[in-house]
Amino acid sequence: MTATLERRESISLWERFCSWITSTENRLYIGWFGVLMIPTLLTATTCYIIAFIAAPPVDIDGIREPVAGSLLYGNNIISGAVIPSSNAIGVHFYPVWEAASVDEWLYNGGPYQLIVLHFLLGVASYMGREWELSYRLGMRPWIFVAFSAPVAAASAVFLVYPIGQGSFSDGMPLGISGTFNFMLVFQAEHNILMHPFHMAGVAGVFGGSLFSAMHGSLVTSSLIRETSEVESTNYGYKFGQEEETYNIVAAHGYFGRLIFQYASFNNSRALHFFLAAWPVVRIWLTALGVTTMAFNLNGFNFNQSVVDSQGRVINTWADIINRADLGMEVMHERNAHNFPLDLAAGEVLPVAVSAPAVHA
């Protein structure tokens, strides 16, 4: 009798690590994008929490007038924020080793850059991880495509806009009231409400909410009952079942009669593609709009008032918007400049043609 001994091939530590990283059997999929995502998001989150609680005031305008944003310096959850990097830094890369000391780094708002850049790397890696997991499971890649919309929006306000404006101090502060301040100043300087891409984004967000509510309520209202009247309808559903869980024909008939026939989808794939594409495409457009306004290609501007035959101004809604924009522009960075750019850049008007003669 001949005995055959098979020699087991030893698997290296690196191969075992690669197998574990790319395994779809893990409770949470890691993936190669996850190797980048985990440290960057942990770094951004840790720095954000510490800065929101305890960061010292930041000289955001670069004029030696620090602005406090942390809880320990008198703010609350609503007013608190991580203040953007100083205007004195501009768009220079400002890691902690570029400063003379940690105190200087904190004074110039270094944590803002650290948080924002790690956050953007992290969410981009999360997006890549969605594609990677879909690929390994044999799924189509549309989940990652949909998530690209919020990634594009975040990149626009945190990275592209500061680069276009020439300073990270123009980026969105990392806090509730700071976000609102950013929105008001953005409107004042770029008239974003009159930009067609922003209008598309508003329609995408509100329309997406409406369509999501309509779809969820229609599906929930047309579930196929597999249980008795005394049991919950939900008990009739088995996870992974092949049978339809709701009656799309009934939902289509209901909605077609509620609005009109062609307002309703009778194809489930077309319906779900529309539900995904409507907000995603429009948020892409909004991010593109912010990108164009970063380089001062602004919303529609109606600076010329409507006048009658005698030259008197006939006030329109555009005049009200312009006046509100000027007011907001005057209010922000009040100590950095005395007049908004729209006024300061105008033609100089003589106050007096000649000085009066003074007789002693």
Curated annotation (Swiss-Prot):
Site (Stabilizes free radical intermediate) residue list: 190
Residues annotated as signal peptide: none
Maturation-removed propeptide residues: 345-360
Swiss-Prot/TrEMBL keywords: Calcium, Chlorophyll, Chloroplast, Chromophore, Electron transport, Herbicide resistance, Iron, Magnesium, Manganese, Membrane, Metal-binding, Oxidoreductase, Photosynthesis, Photosystem II, Plastid, Thylakoid, Transmembrane, Transmembrane helix, Transport
Residues binding chlorophyll a ChlzD1: 118
GO molecular function terms listed in the Swiss-Prot or TrEMBL record: chlorophyll binding; electron transporter, transferring electrons within the cyclic electron transport pathway of photosynthesis activity; iron ion binding; oxidoreductase activity, acting on diphenols and related substances as donors, oxygen as acceptor
Catalytic activity field: 2 a plastoquinone + 4 hnu + 2 H2O = 2 a plastoquinol + O2
Record-annotated membrane-spanning stretches: 29-46, 118-133, 142-156, 197-218, 274-288
Record's subunit section: PSII is composed of 1 copy each of membrane proteins PsbA, PsbB, PsbC, PsbD, PsbE, PsbF, PsbH, PsbI, PsbJ, PsbK, PsbL, PsbM, PsbT, PsbX, PsbY, PsbZ, Psb30/Ycf12, at least 3 peripheral proteins of the oxygen-evolving complex and a large number of cofactors. It forms dimeric complexes.
Protein name, per record: Photosystem II protein D1
Originating species: Bumilleriopsis filiformis (Yellow-green alga)
